[in-house]
Regions:
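Bacterial N-terminal signal peptides that target proteins for export
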Residues: 1-8
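Intrinsically disordered, low-complexity tandem-repeat regions
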Residues: 29-30, 34, 39
Length: 413
């Protein structure tokens, strides 16, 4: 009997212990539903757990020490992103030969790229009639002759993630279009005195994207271009989505309008045809009618260490309604002076998947906090800094660089 009593007490204690753990577990109130739900003990990390990533890397290694600002002109809209007078495709001072890099002439490619892209996306693909078309066969033969792999391929491919330097000011228009089952195309257009002075496109794949690393991440400066460059599909197109976006932007700035017959690059036409082009044409009416109360003020400052800092502010009727700060790494690895940061070339601190993985998204947290405080205070330079992690060297550096940019544009609206 005594033995049975001991067993009873033992099992009773087993039941009480988990009940006590649950009782000590903090409760989380769902403000929308008004219900109280339990939060798993493991899901609530301690401060030491949150900061554990800091012990895995030396944060001092992620700072550009002794960097110097490039001397630039701070007159608004002084720099031109493209050369409108050139017969060549000149974007941000670099000449692009998309006839050569696309693997086929644009004229022929425009006839076939949509079908070929569908095939490589694993969808139904082109009809047999189209595949048998002599011009299609000709285009594919040209493409095969230009096929490159390995380092030769990387050397042949070139895309830029650099924004225009200096200050840009004008009326602001933005749009978003969901296409192809969850992909999101974004467009921002700035117009000053009837001139389109700036346009920037970006794309975000759905959260169900087959490559989970890129699911829900923007593509322009995240490192997605390298993911595409490793794909067999680009062995002959030699073009990334970033090339395709830049080419569309060049056409808009060259034509000075949004509604016209766009040309697309071989290998990046799906996003253009189904996302960006329809979006830009939808925005054309709004731009033509000057139907906006928003103003854009942006500034990009290059540094000699291979990083450019960028601040973009959106005003609506004089009130700050949005802000974004970013730091963009150089297009060429050798231009980045800090060895630790070289691997992030053609990416930015805000968008880079790998940079944010290594630094625990600390830069994104900084930018989100910065945006929140600026919107609350309605000042680019006068706001509380308690929530900003200035004890981290790379964040302290970013904050100081931000203040320099903010000081340059705080009186411009």
């Amino acid at each position: 009997m005594r033995k049975q009593s001991k067993f009873f007490i033992f099992f009773l204690l087993l039941g009480v212990f988990p009940l006590q753990v649950n009782a000590d577990t903090p409760a989380k109130v769902d403000a929308k539903a008004g219900a109280t739900t339990k939060v798993d003990v493991v899901s609530t990390p301690t401060v030491s757990q949150v900061d554990k990533w800091k012990t895995l890397i030396n944060l001092e290694d992620y700072v550009c020490n002794n960097k110097k600002r490039e001397k630039i002109n701070y007159t608004p809209n002084y720099y031109k992103y493209i050369d409108k007078n050139s017969n060549e495709i000149v974007i941000n001072g670099r000449v692009y030969d998309y006839d050569a890099s696309s693997g086929a002439s644009r004229t022929v490619a425009d006839m076939v790229n949509h079908s070929q892209t569908l095939k490589y996306d694993g969808k139904k693909g082109a009809s047999k009639e189209l595949e048998a078309d002599p011009k299609v066969k000709e285009a594919m033969e040209l493409a095969k002759k230009k096929t490159k792999k390995g380092q030769e391929k990387i050397n042949a491919m070139y895309w830029s993630v650099q924004p225009p330097k200096g200050i840009i000011v004008g009326d602001y228009y933005s749009g978003k279009k969901v296409f192809d089952g969850g992909y999101e195309a974004y467009a921002e257009v700035v117009v000053n005195n009837n001139e389109i002075v700036h346009i920037e496109l970006n794309e975000r794949p759905p959260v169900t994207y087959y490559a989970s690393e890129w699911a829900g991440e923007t593509k322009r400066r995240s490192g997605y271009g390298f993911f595409q460059a490793k794909s067999p599909r680009t062995d002959y197109t030699l073009a990334t989505l970033i090339n395709g976006m830049s080419y569309l932007e060049w056409q808009v700035l060259k034509n000075q309008k949004l509604d016209f017959d766009y040309k697309t690059l071989f290998g990046s036409s799906n996003s253009a045809r189904n996302g960006f082009v329809p979006l830009l044409k939808e925005m054309a009416k709004e731009v033509n009618e000057k139907a906006t109360d928003k103003r854009y003020v942006g500034i990009t400052q290059p540094y000699d260490c291979g990083i450019s800092t960028r601040l973009e502010v959106i005003y609506e009727k004089g009130k700050i309604v949005d802000l974004k700060y970013d730091e963009i790494f150089a297009d060429d690895k050798e231009d980045i002076k800090n060895p630790t940061l070289k691997e992030f070339y053609r990416q930015s601190k805000l968008e880079s998947v790998e940079y944010n993985r290594i630094t625990n998204k600390s830069f994104r947290t900084f930018v989100n906090t910065l945006r929140r405080e600026v919107l609350r205070s309605q000042s680019l330079t006068e706001f509380p800094t308690d929530a900003i992690k200035l004890d981290m060297p790379h964040i302290k550096e970013a904050y100081e660089d931000y203040l320099f940019l903010a000081g340059k544009i705080k009186n411009i609206k």
